[in-house]
């Protein structure tokens, strides 16, 4: 019925079979159904099956097996009983908008740029098509505009069946020589560029119910491009969500929505300036700590805990080990972790890999590296802080 009377979303039917499936549910077959089974890139209908004894039982999925439409339910039904099948109208509308919209968008890129649709996928919140051409931003926008103009013209959509032997004589957008028997054709009037494609999905009788076609993003994919888009109700849902995010961002920046980009550019410039100042301060701090630690070192070895972040800790270690004979083991806290770095100059006596292994064993840390430099971390706890004090109380040479 979804093919012959697509506008009918409810009917009574007789149960032909109802068998358990491996998902702890049941696959229900009836003598007729308004439910569309998943296929041709379109998601399946969902809805309910009703009988007086069980009430409304959800149909969570619908699929075709050996030419038979099966409805996945959570409860069994008796063979021969009469049930009422009802499709979720909101979902059917949304899915049909996406599928008819996909035909129009694919048609637009074919007419304008000779780009062939080589893939179509409908997910819960977006739809994608894959084209065999990579298109520019301007070409993507031109195709979107062309498709929407077809929607606004309320162009007629005609659905008919032909024998596969007649397909070579039809101006189909896509050819498929593997088809046989009776084939369903969906045609959209577009002047000299009539859209015609084989299809098993649900469609409107005209283009207006698609409402709107909006490209959300596009990216190079294989040798062509992948276009993500939404139509009708789904397009409105995307716009509503993104508009809310835009307004929230604008409010946080104290600007109007159309001023968000410039405001973010100013913020980025400010952040870059602050980062430069921070780098300069960190360099000064590293120099001061390096001079202090160098003076406190014994036999060109130092082990110390520093109240700085790990980036600063690494900079200080690098500064110290600019002295070819120097070796350093430095610790610091970052968030809820205790971190360490071991480093040496090219003639330094410390084996940093061996030192990391010993520190890991003492602190329960994870890390490693080379004989020249190593690093690691562990959770900061009272126990690890006590172990750190013990490490720092011993000569750093003991880590070698």
What are these regions (language model features)?
Residues 1-400:
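A glycine- and charged-residue-rich anion-binding loop/surface
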């Amino acid at each position: 019925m979804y093919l012959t009377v697509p506008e009918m979303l409810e009917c009574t039917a007789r149960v032909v079979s109802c068998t358990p499936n491996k998902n702890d549910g049941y696959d229900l077959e009836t003598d007729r159904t308004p439910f569309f089974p998943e296929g041709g890139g379109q998601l399946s209908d969902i809805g309910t099956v009703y009988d007086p004894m069980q009430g409304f039982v959800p149909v969570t999925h619908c699929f075709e097996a050996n030419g038979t439409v099966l409805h996945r339910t959570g409860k069994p039904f008796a063979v021969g009983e009469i049930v009422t099948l009802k499709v979720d109208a909101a979902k059917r509308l949304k899915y049909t908008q996406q599928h008819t919209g996909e035909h129009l968008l694919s048609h637009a890129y074919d007419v304008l740029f000779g780009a062939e649709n080589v893939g179509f996928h409908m997910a819960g919140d977006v739809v994608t098509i894959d084209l065999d051409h990579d298109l520019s931003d301007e070409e993507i926008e031109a195709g979107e505009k062309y498709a929407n103009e077809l929607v606004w013209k309320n162009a007629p959509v005609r659905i008919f069946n032909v024998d596969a032997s007649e397909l070579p004589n039809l101006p189909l957008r896509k050819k498929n020589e593997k088809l046989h028997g009776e084939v369903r054709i969906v045609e959209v009037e577009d002047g000299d560029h009539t859209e015609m494609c084989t299809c098993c999905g649900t469609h409107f009788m005209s283009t207006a119910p698609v409402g709107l076609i909006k490209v959300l993003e596009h990216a190079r994919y294989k040798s062509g491009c992948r276009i993500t888009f939404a139509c009708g109700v789904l397009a409105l849902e995307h716009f509503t969500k993104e508009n809310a995010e835009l307004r929230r961002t604008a409010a946080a920046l104290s600007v109007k929505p159309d001023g968000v980009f410039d405001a973010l550019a100013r913020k980025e410039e400010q952040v870059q300036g602050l980062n430069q100042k921070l780098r300069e301060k960190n360099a000064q701090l590293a120099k001061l700590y390096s001079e202090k630690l160098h003076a406190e070192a014994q036999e060109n070895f130092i082990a110390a805990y520093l109240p700085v972040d790990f980036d600063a800790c690494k900079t200080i270690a690098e500064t110290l080990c600019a002295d070819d004979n120097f070796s350093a083991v430095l610790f610091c806290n970052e968030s809820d972790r205790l971190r360490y770095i071991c480093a040496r100059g090219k003639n330094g006596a410390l084996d940093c890999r061996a030192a990391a292994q010993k520190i890991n064993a003492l602190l329960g840390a994870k890390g490693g590296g080379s004989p020249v430099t190593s690093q690691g971390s562990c959770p900061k706890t009272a126990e690890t802080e006590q172990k750190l004090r013990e490490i720092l109380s011993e000569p750093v040479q003991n880590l070698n």
